[in-house]
Amino acid sequence: MRPSGRKTDQMRKVSFERNFSKHAEGSCLVKFGDTHVLCTASLEDKTPPWLRNTGKGWVTAEYGMLPRATGERMKREAAAGKQGGRTQEIQRLIGRSLRAVVDLQALGERQITLDCDVIQADGGTRTASITGGWIALYDCLKWMESRNMIKVDRVLKDHVAAISCGVFASQAVIDLDYLEDSSAETDANFVMTGAGGIVEIQGTAEGTPFTEEEFTSLMGLAKNGIGELVALQKQAIAG
């Protein structure tokens, strides 16, 4: 039995609030249950040095947590003068995941930065950031299209979404909250496209190694869950 009472294949309630910020070209407040992340997409008319004069653009990401996003206040990383390893790992994952569905040549020599700021954390912040980040990216590209800068359907090749799965109390479960994640026997994150392509899989056994059969169960849960998330993304951008 899961602490939340959810079924093994039941995700938390997911919602997207588009255009949350009046300043950013694209923005979305994404909620996976009690995990809330503000994703903003900012356009800059420049590219990283290694892409200059190539005709290609770039999509990158930064990730952070508000000091009281968790049960106890955390010190701001800016106050410490450097980012932690976890932060760097997560923001690179977000950037890779979004670039997987972007035609950088069609974007042109421009950079879009996704800022994913966790307002409240209850497990799955990286997967929420990727899933909500896609919405913010889409709205940024629509903003560009309205100004005759690009065509969205040429730049954005597919949807991308992410979900966590794990083995909790000897059962394969989807979308772990913090209570489950902190005591899971196996923890994995899956990033996939709308067409079912695998972008990235991160899986770790916290104690006893997991079996191929358990991994197959997690993969099945993830495929179904990401299918649901992509359907919710489509519903959000149609509204």
From Swiss-Prot:
It comes from the Bacteria. Phosphate binds at residues 86, 124-126. GO terms for biological process: rRNA catabolic process; rRNA processing; tRNA processing. Its EC number is 2.7.7.56. The keyword DNA-binding does not apply. Keywords: Nucleotidyltransferase, RNA-binding, rRNA processing, Transferase, tRNA processing, tRNA-binding. One of its GO terms (molecular function) is tRNA binding. It catalyses: tRNA(n+1) + phosphate = tRNA(n) + a ribonucleoside 5'-diphosphate. InterPro entries: ExoRNase_PH_dom1, ExoRNase_PH_dom2, ExoRNase_PH_dom2_sf, PNPase/RNase_PH_dom_sf, Ribosomal_Su5_D2-typ_SF, RNase_PH, RNase_PH_bac-type, RNase_PH_CS. Belongs to the RNase PH family. Homohexameric ring arranged as a trimer of dimers. Phosphorolytic 3'-5' exoribonuclease that plays an important role in tRNA 3'-end maturation. Removes nucleotide residues following the 3'-CCA terminus of tRNAs; can also add nucleotides to the ends of RNA molecules by using nucleoside diphosphates as substrates, but this may not be physiologically important. Probably plays a role in initiation of 16S rRNA degradation (leading to ribosome degradation) during starvation. This is Ribonuclease PH. The gene is rph.
